């Protein structure tokens, strides 16, 4: 029999950090109630005989005392606690776990590397958008998981005994950021990956996602520096060079890198460079969730959507009372426009999908107030939890919604980093036109619109007599041509 409580908790006793995630089940989806994370650096407390030091164990117990208070009102059957790499190998893990279970009041399961990889993939499949066929990479403090899969099913599961804490202690223990340190760390990581590389490459993948603190740190760095969100080997090598220039770990300064993440960033970076090199990864983006989300979704009777983004968009529409028929009407129009100019404007499937998402959410600001509805919409999208969308994609959607009507904020379109600024500008133009043409909110009042693009010049051709028969929309289009002209986007209505 299911508990009446809608609260669930997942706790991950990792080698670098302990994490707790508490959620509430709401209408078939989850709402985050609390996230607590503490750096305990458990792996750093292992001696040559794999015994945890008293200090490391005490750091862990102090953290669990914090967690235990939050767990008191959650049924034990709705709590899952797992321990990973360090507690798999610690000779005195039993002593630590006995006290941990007393503090938490529930069992702590030490899971195998393969089970950890499976749970990570489960978390990614529930929270991350993109292609059905993926490679998932998670660099933890004491282990690194590599998983391929299709949809919700993993196809290969690997857990390697290398992590950002163990590599820190092994290859950066002198606190120097020299070429030799990085070379040794990378070569050791490549030697770990090489035996499984062929198996992973044989499965293949269409997208690669990273689900670790190292990848999160890279995303924060790239957003701070105005780079696009895709992680590439070239960007990783540039960041390595910047770290080497800093000379010492204590003097590591990279724009966007927080002090909290700095200590294990070089070791995590060296492992990631090795993974990119051995597996020939072209690019990677940040996953929406991993181990903790995998634990939670394992307890919740929720289906894995084939497209997590579709579920998210549907949930947001329902929550903010969006007219789904009008949203779909605008989406279909915008998609038609995008397909007509896709070759000239270099709009790929990814760009068109993000444009469609903006269309489906463009009216959420009306739930706050008609006045400044675009600003309200942008604010909501910026701060809502949108599973399936990366932080950079959320920023792009917010930017498009803020620019959906009226004055155009060009700097805002340049500040997002999900797409090239020129592509974002072109999506904005198409969204604005689709909203105008769909303003009657009826399918039988949509004209046959033909678009032609020549660089930034956009010509909109309408059936003969249409403008005369529709004076309001003719006026809106005339004003739109002026708005776009102010930012040097030539728009011709014919």
Swiss-Prot record:
For the keyword Cell membrane, the answer is no
Q: What does the record give as EC number?
A: 3.6.1.40
Catalytic activities? guanosine 3'-diphosphate 5'-triphosphate + H2O = guanosine 3',5'-bis(diphosphate) + phosphate + H(+)
Q: In which pathway does it act?
A: Purine metabolism; ppGpp biosynthesis; ppGpp from GTP: step 2/2
Q: List where this protein forms a coiled coil.
A: none
Organism's domain of life? Bacteria
Q: Which GO terms describe its biological process?
A: guanosine pentaphosphate catabolic process; guanosine tetraphosphate biosynthetic process; nucleobase-containing small molecule interconversion
Identification of the protein by name: Guanosine-5'-triphosphate,3'-diphosphate pyrophosphatase
This protein's species is Erwinia tasmaniensis (strain DSM 17950 / CFBP 7177 / CIP 109463 / NCPPB 4357 / Et1/99)
Lineage, opening ranks: Bacteria, Pseudomonadati, Pseudomonadota, Gammaproteobacteria, Enterobacterales
- Tell me the gene name: gppA
């Amino acid at each position: 029999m299911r508990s009446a409580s809608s609260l669930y908790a997942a706790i991950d006793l990792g080698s670098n950090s302990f994490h707790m995630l508490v959620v509430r089940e709401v209408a078939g989806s989850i709402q985050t109630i609390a996230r607590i994370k503490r750096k305990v650096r458990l792996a750093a407390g292992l001696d040559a005989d794999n015994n945890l030091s008293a200090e490391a164990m005490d750091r862990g117990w102090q953290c669990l005392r914090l967690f235990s208070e939050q767990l008191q009102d959650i049924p034990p059957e709705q709590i899952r606690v797992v321990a990973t790499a360090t507690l798999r190998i610690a000779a005195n893990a039993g002593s630590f776990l006995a006290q941990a279970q007393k503090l938490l009041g529930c069992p702590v399961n030490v899971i195998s590397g393969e089970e950890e990889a499976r749970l990570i993939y489960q978390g990614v499949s529930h929270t991350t958008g993109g292609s059905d066929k993926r490679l998932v990479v998670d660099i933890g403090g004491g282990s690194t998981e590599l998983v391929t899969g299709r949809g919700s099913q993993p196809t290969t599961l690997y857990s390697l005994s290398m992590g950002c804490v163990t590599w820190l202690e092994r290859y950066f223990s002198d606190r120097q950021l020299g070429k030799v340190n990085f070379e040794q760390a990378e070569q050791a990581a490549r030697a770990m990956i090489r035996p499984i590389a062929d198996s992973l490459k044989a499965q293949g993948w269409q997208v690669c996602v990273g689900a670790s603190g190292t990848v999160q740190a890279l995303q924060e760095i790239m957003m701070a520096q105005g780079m696009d969100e895709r992680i590439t080997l070239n960007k990783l090598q540039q960041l390595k060079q910047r770290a080497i220039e800093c000379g010492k770990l204590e003097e590591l300064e990279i724009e966007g890198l927080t002090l909290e993440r700095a200590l294990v960033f070089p070791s995590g970076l060296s492992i990631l460079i090795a993974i990119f090199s051995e597996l020939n990864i072209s690019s990677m983006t940040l996953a929406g969730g991993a181990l903790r989300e995998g634990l939670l979704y394992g307890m919740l009777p929720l289906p894995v959507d084939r497209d997590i983004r579709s579920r998210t968009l549907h949930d947001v529409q329902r929550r903010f009372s969006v007219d789904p028929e009008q949203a779909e009407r605008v989406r279909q129009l915008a998609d038609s426009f995008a397909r007509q100019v896709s070759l000239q404007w270099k709009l790929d499937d990814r760009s068109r999908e993000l444009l469609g998402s903006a269309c489906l959410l463009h009216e959420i600001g009306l739930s706050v107030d008609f006045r400044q509805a675009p600003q309200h919409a942008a604010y909501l999208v910026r701060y809502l939890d949108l599973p399936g969308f990366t932080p950079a994609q959320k920023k792009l959607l917010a930017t498009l919604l803020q620019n959906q009507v009226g004055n155009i904020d060009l700097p805002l379109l340049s500040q997002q980093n999900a797409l090239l600024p020129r592509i974002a500008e072109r999506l904005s133009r198409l969204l604005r036109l689709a909203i105008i043409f769909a303003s009657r909110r009826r399918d039988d009042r949509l004209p046959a619109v033909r678009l032609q693009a020549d660089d930034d010049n956009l010509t909109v051709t309408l059936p003969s007599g249409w403008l005369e028969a529709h004076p309001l929309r003719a006026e809106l289009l005339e004003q739109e041509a002026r708005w776009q002209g102010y930012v040097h986007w030539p728009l011709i209505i014919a």
